[in-house]
């Protein structure tokens, strides 16, 4: 579905990512992990067009999307979240998701000021879709609650809902479990697994929460100092000596 080939990024004399290759298959959750500064978010920024690679290619299906603008990459179904929230705190949960659905719709200025029957029907459809998305992420009971009253875990779920509003084929999440307690992270994991195969075709998870990663991932890619040091199933990565050394700072015994 998505292929990363020999991807590299340099900032001046600093190599942030070096010759990294991996693929994401339809129907799987792939997690990208590594210590702080390993190059995870840099890799995500290269995939989604926020950085231009120094070398290497990014292919999505049959298309080479290397260096395309972020909006062009989003238009083909690659949607990402950011570490910094994009939630509108003054709106309700439903209002946030409905606003996001409108943002990715086809309403013109003329239609907005002179709504006809078709526009009213479209608005009703968007409202139904927004409500369905809120339910998908487990926030139906909080539908009419303002976002600034949500817990940290609920805010993260709302961020996922906003991303779903763009109609992603490949959903990419940048540290969605940051700041969550164990129960909230488990709830998030359950939502992500339910979304696979129903709302999205594949998922890329950049994450530090190892319990979440091991629970939801089909495969894991591990970066350290900008290089890929391991790739495989969760059980294999957990016992990989290079991964243990990268995280603990000492050779595995």
Language-model segments: which ranges?
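Glycine-rich phosphate-binding loops of nucleotide-dependent enzymes
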Residues: 1-253
């Amino acid at each position: 579905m998505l292929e990363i080939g020999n991807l590299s990024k340099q900032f001046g004399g600093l190599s942030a990512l070096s010759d990294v290759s991996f693929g994401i298959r339809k129907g799987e959750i792939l997690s990208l992990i590594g210590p702080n500064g390993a190059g995870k978010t840099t890799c995500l920024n290269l995939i989604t067009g926020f950085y231009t690679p120094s070398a290497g290619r990014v292919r999505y299906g049959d298309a080479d999307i290397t260096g395309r603008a972020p909006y062009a990459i989003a238009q083909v179904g690659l949607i990402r979240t950011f570490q910094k929230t994009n939630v509108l705190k003054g709106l309700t949960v439903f209002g946030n998701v409905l606003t996001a659905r409108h943002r990715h719709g086809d309403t013109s200025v003329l239609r907005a000021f002179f709504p006809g029957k078709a526009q009213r029907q479209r608005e009703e459809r968007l409202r139904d879709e927004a409500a369905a998305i809120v339910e998908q992420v487990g926030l139906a009971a909080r539908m009419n609650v303002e976002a600034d009253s949500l817990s940290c875990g609920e805010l993260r779920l709302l961020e996922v809902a906003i991303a779903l509003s763009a109609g992603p084929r490949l959903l990419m999440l940048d540290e969605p479990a940051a700041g969550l307690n164990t129960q909230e992270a488990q709830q998030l994991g359950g939502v992500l697994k339910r979304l696979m195969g129903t709302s999205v075709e594949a998922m890329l998870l950049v994450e530090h929460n190892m319990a979440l990663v091991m629970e939801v991932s089909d495969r894991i890619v591990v970066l350290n100092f900008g290089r890929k040091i391991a790739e495989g199933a969760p059980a294999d990565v957990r016992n990989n000596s290079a991964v243990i050394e990268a995280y603990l700072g000492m050779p595995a015994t």
